[in-house]
Amino acid sequence: MGLSFSGARPCCCRNNVLITDDGEVVSLTAHDFDVVDIESEEEGNFYVPPDMRVVTRAPGRQRLRSSDPPSRHTHRRTPGGACPATQFPPPMSDSE
């Protein structure tokens, strides 16, 4: 058994909400779904076995877009493998 929502199109405005073709806003809760038999061939195939699933991209690290901010856990390294030394100006003396 599985859950299926019929007669609705996705809404990009709010999370967990669908807007039906009639314009009705529906919150996505368990009460808004109909119970269906996922092994049934009547309405289409609801279950795809893992070995038959289509992979659209290879798993792995995602590349950052230029608009993405760097992660605070990302450390940039020099080609030698060591972190570059931070250079600060010399401290000011009392005479300055």
From Swiss-Prot:
Localisation: Virion tegument; Virion membrane; Host cell membrane; Host Golgi apparatus membrane
Protein's GO biological process: anatomical structure morphogenesis; viral budding from Golgi membrane
Membrane topology: Lipid-anchor
GO CC list: host cell Golgi membrane; host cell plasma membrane; membrane; viral tegument; virion membrane
One Pfam family per UniProt: UL11
Annotated motif Di-leucine-like internalization motif, positions: 18-19
Biased composition (Pro residues): 87-96
Post-translation changes: Myristoylation and palmitoylation (probably on one or more of the nearby cysteines at the N-terminus) enable membrane-binding and Golgi apparatus-specific targeting and are essential for efficient packaging. Phosphorylated. Phosphorylation does not seem to be required for recycling to the host Golgi apparatus. Packaging is selective for underphosphorylated forms.
Residues recorded with modification Phosphoserine: S40
Entry keyword annotation includes Ribosomal protein: no
Residue numbers with lipid attached (N-myristoyl glycine): G2
Top-rank taxon, per record: Viruses
InterPro entries tied to this protein: Tegument_UL11_Herpesvir (IPR024351), UL11_simplexvirus (IPR016395)
Transmembrane region(s): none
Keywords: Host cell membrane, Host Golgi apparatus, Host membrane, Lipoprotein, Membrane, Myristate, Palmitate, Phosphoprotein, Virion, Virion tegument
Region (Disordered): 57-96
Location of the region described as Asp/Glu-rich (acidic) in the Swiss-Prot/TrEMBL record: 37-43
HAMAP family: HSV_CEP3_alphahv
SUBUNIT field: Interacts with cytoplasmic envelopment protein 2; this interaction is essential for the proper localization of each protein to the assembly complex and thus for the production of infectious virus. Interacts with gE (via C-terminus). Interacts with gD (via C-terminus). Interacts with UL56.
Family from the record: Belongs to the herpesviridae cytoplasmic envelopment protein 3 family.
Biological role stated in the UniProt entry: Plays an important role in the cytoplasmic envelopment of tegument proteins and capsids during the assembly and egress processes. Also participates in viral entry at the fusion step probably by regulating the core fusion machinery.
Protein name: Cytoplasmic envelopment protein 3
Lineage: Viruses, Duplodnaviria, Heunggongvirae, Peploviricota, Herviviricetes
